[in-house]
Amino acid sequence: MKHAVASLAMLFAVALMAGCATQEGPATTRPDESLVNTYWKLTALDGESPDVVDGQREPHFVLHADPARVMGSTGCNRMMGNYRLEASTLRFMALSSTRMACPHGASIERRFLAALNATTAWRIEGERLWLLDAQHETLARFEAVHLQ
């Protein structure tokens, strides 16, 4: 009888502890951002974080759907052009920019435009975008920014 009471007490204690445990739901991941109509802020170029220069805009772009236009900033100048998107391929075409003289940021601007011109593919995971070259090597990485 003592054995039965001890077993019953132990079973009650285990049930009580199980009831107090927190349950975790399934892991939630953020859905992938849309490539089009999203503000993409440059976070890495040639594997390095770009320097943001005081008084200049951050390098970024937005792909607009109709017509298929790209607009953004190189960090120094405004840029614009066209793009063609087919499944996982992306090509920027006829890119142009304003020609303001900026004492800082010319190197980033040149490399940013070169990366856009070399882009052939893209990949999005959550709020991050990678622009890839023909060998699927990363040219630039971006982060989605939600404007209020």
Give residue ranges: language-model regions.
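Lipid interaction determinants
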Residues: 2-9, 18-148
